[in-house]
């Protein structure tokens, strides 16, 4: 299960597993963003291709408005997923 909550500095903290069963929940959050956000992945254990698709759609929508998503505290496994998919070229990963 995926939990998305706002942190103390207005970043979004993701916890759990971001898979196909959580896409509708996440889509509602990410596609409602009107400005760039930092996504804290420190509690994220897994992301599927469906999760990547939601993030890509949000990034595309935000970039058309001059904003972007920034990812922080990305574990090695998820960092590899972004690298192998080429998403490390699309997202700023700190």
Predicted regions, residues:
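Short acidic-hydrophobic, aromatic-tinged amphipathic segments that line or gate anion-handling sites
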Residues: 92-94
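Amphipathic alpha-helical interaction surfaces in cytosolic regulatory modules
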Residues: 20-90
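Glycine/Thr-rich beta-alpha phosphate-binding loop at enzyme active sites
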Residues: 15-19
């Amino acid at each position: 299960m995926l939990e998305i909550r706002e942190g103390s500095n207005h970043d979004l903290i993701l916890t759990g597993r971001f898979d196909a069963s959580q896409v509708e929940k996440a889509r509602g959050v990410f596609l409602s963003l009107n400005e760039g956000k930092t996504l804290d992945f420190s509690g994220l254990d897994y992301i599927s291709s469906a999760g990547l698709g939601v993030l890509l759609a949000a990034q595309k929508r935000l970039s058309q408005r001059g904003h972007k998503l920034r990812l922080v505290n990305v574990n090695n496994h998820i960092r590899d997923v972004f690298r192998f998919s080429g998403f490390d070229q699309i997202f700023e990963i700190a």
